[in-house]
Amino acid sequence: MFHPYRKTLLSGTVALALGLFATGAIAAGFQPAQPAGKLGAIVVDPYGNAPLTALIELDSHTISDVKVTVHGKGEKGVPVSYSVGKQSLATYDGIPVFGLYQKHANKVTVEYTENGKAMKEDYVIQTSAIVNRYMDNRSISDLQKTKVIKVAPGFEDRLYLVNTHTFTPQGAEFHWHGEKDKNAGLLDAGPAAGALPFDIAPFTFVVDTEGEYRWWLDQDTFYDGHDMNINKRGYLMGIRETPRGTFTAVQGQHWYEFDMMGQVLADHKLPRGFLDATHESIETVNGTVLLRVGKRNYRKEDGLHVHTIRDQIIEVDKSGRVIDVWDLTKILDPLRDSLLGALDAGAVCVNVDLEHAGQQAKLEPDTPFGDALGVGAERNWAHVNPIAYDAKDDAIILSSRHQGIVKIGSDKKVKWILAPAKGWNKQLASKLLKPVDSKGNPLTCNENGKCENTDFDFSYTQHTAWLTDKGTLTVFDNGDGRWLEQPALPSMKYSRFVEYKIDEKNGTVQPLWQYGKERGYDFYSPITSVIEYQKDRDTIFGFSGSINLFEVGQPTIGKINEIDYKTKDVKVEIDVLSDKPNQTHYRALLVHPQQMFK
């Protein structure tokens, strides 16, 4: 028979024993890392997203005049040095260390002032290997290899962030279910809609001029290819630096802000009426962010609702609320097909079809809805990739791969169009820029864009139509569909880095600078890519993201270049090789640690 007193006594004894055990466990708990020097402990990868970063904790010290140097590895290693400002010290409660090598005992020197006394300390920071979580039988390598071809004196300190990707074993798994036609039966399959299948794992890193990885964004930061969750799927693109030294980016149904320490500062879902963000995010001088998206449940003239493809620009504030919308289906002409029918069927942006490479695309009236080449809001008619913001008149400049380069004001009126004349309706044709030579004399060009007795050329299937601080426009001219046709042989194609001067008052365009045509097919990059003028070294930086794309079974080359503006000499050339064959890269950009830790 169970005695109530014995039960109480037993319960009390057990409770006392557990209490003593718990108290002992707390008293004997594992200790935190102890100070590594005169400051605090070192924490590698403090936010869990950037394993080649670390923090030296302040441990309640008040310091200033901070400088960090991550020493190069071996005799030829590239040191990474930068100052750390008051704001960064307060933000991280420590000294941010950027530019570590993977799986290496990194030598780091920190200089600072405390209580008026100059201090200098040396540390050794151990890192682990970085890991590609998406490998399969197609993998050529675990990480994307690099090949340094040339680095001129004076450019050794350059660091390049590569925004590329790797195929997942399962491929694209999702699509939006579109609205059925009114004549469709109950059991008839619904059509695809939107661009949800645009889904691939990110591969984001910084490379130095020795070809070494010096930063890595963990693939799980924004993406999860192992879970059926569309909020963690998409295509991480449009990584652009803000004035604060942070970065914005888009992926699928979200847009983000993060820093180089791996801290995610903002994670916003797209506003309710929009979906499928890819290609671009850019912060304006007003502190707002421009995003390239599609429209959810767009109603066509026949009453059918569709999700549009890459033809909407939204401006959002830092809380994610919509400030403005540019609906290109109403501003441009979604039925213009002059370039669409001239494209290489083997590659439309990052959608690659090797079996039809080199063949001219055929536009069929019954082309399926969704992310398919064709006219109408329900198809990939515009394909806007990068965006530029012109603060002088509060306007945007869009690179529409399938239409041309267009400047549009905040009033939604087209200011000018840079494209061949063929196929534009009367209203838009009046906005076409007229080509002129260096003296302002008109050039003779046919409607397909072929010009006589000049080296002027329009850009075709272009990327990154960005403004320079000189007021000129730099464009990566991919060159597919040049003169609105496919050449007799694919090897006749070429890509260019181009600079144009736009005279908005007179409606003219003048060629100023070009590079790449002379390098021929070996330099041809049919899709993606970027160029940008670099004032600090007077160079044109370029990343040709899809060289070698159609060579079956071979890695695709993403070629990093800096070209001297005056002489056109190659100052930097580094190849990035995809880890799986025929897998394109997207973009790259220069990063400056001095600007990231103010």
Curated annotation (Swiss-Prot):
GO terms for cellular component: periplasmic space. It is an enzyme of class 2 (transferase). It catalyses: an aryl sulfate + a phenol = an aryl sulfate + a phenol; 4-methylumbelliferone sulfate + phenol = phenyl sulfate + 4-methylumbelliferone; 2-naphthyl sulfate + phenol = phenyl sulfate + 2-naphthol. It comes from Lelliottia amnigena. Belongs to the aryl sulfotransferase family. Coiled coil: none annotated. It comes from the Bacteria. The keyword Ubl conjugation does not apply. It is found in: Periplasm. InterPro entries: Arylsulfate_ST (IPR053143), Arylsulfotran_N (IPR035391), Arylsulfotransferase_bact (IPR010262), AssT_Enterobac (IPR028610), ASST_N_sf (IPR038477). This is Arylsulfate sulfotransferase AssT. Residues 1-27 form the signal peptide. The active site is at residue 463. 4-methylumbelliferone binds at residues 279, 383, 463. Optimum pH is 9.0 using p-nitrophenyl sulfate as a donor and phenol as an acceptor substrate.
